[in-house]
Amino acid sequence: MSVEVTKLASGLTVVTDTMPHLETAALGVWAGVGGRDERPEEHGISHLIEHMAFKGTTRRSAREIVEEIEAVGGDLNAGTSTETTAYYARVMKADVPLALDVLSDILANPSFAPDELEREKNVIVQEIGASQDTPDDIVFEHLNELCYPDQPIGRSLLGTAKTLKRFDRDMLRHYLATHYRAPDMVVAAAGAVDHRHVVAEVAQRFASFDGGLAPKPQAATFGNGGGRVVHRDLEQAHLTLGLEGVPQADPSLFSLQVFTNALGGGMSSRLFQEVREKRG
């Protein structure tokens, strides 16, 4: 079987899917931390740290981080979600060690330079403004707030201008140290990779990550219902309906996913055919 899994002594998990016929590899680091791990005063810090990871380390400048990967024809990116933050790269097989070195460097040695931090805060404030000009974003932001009121899982990932203003280098370092723990991290690689080589590289380059456990996020509690209407000067109305689902480990989850696709998952779905095709 091409998929292999190894758990290091620190608790960090390494997963590979070897595809010998390929000449390239995709690899990344997934940390089990996201928006739902934030306290009210930390709202938006997970996403900010993801941005700041590319803004320089104690070994590389922001420019050197991207140039080292792009100089060998690769690309580098990241993303934050409610429950995870991912940092990933795609490179030729000979450059897998380089990619792992860069990924480990931006997480283990970020400089969080004050001037870069202030600049990136402003970038995210602009993101917030753009989101507020996008009806699709607005409607789901309000839906999440209603489904999970007064909970981190119900808040937007971007934070607010007020919370962003408070963040400084020490706050980012503390959050990184307490939430980016080896037992809650996975390094995954697929393509032209050798499992033993990847494990050896990861064991060396990610050795500085603490083996302790990160704080547990607040348990989610579904809201008591209700609705909200937000008026904007637009030509279309955007509607959402949220219902409580089942836990991820529930056996009926797969049936629910089939139902979701049948209802609105594609052009042949019930809602697509009824709303768009029949009613325009």
What role is predicted for each listed range?
Residues 1, 224-227:
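Short beta-strand-initiation
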Residues 7, 15-18, 62-217, 229-230, ...:
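Charge-rich, well-structured scaffold segments of protease-associated domains
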Residues 11, 18-69, 180, 251-263, ...:
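Active/ligand-binding-proximal structured segments within catalytic/core domains
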Residues 217-225:
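Short proline/glycine- and acidic-rich turn/helix-capping motifs at secondary-structure junctions
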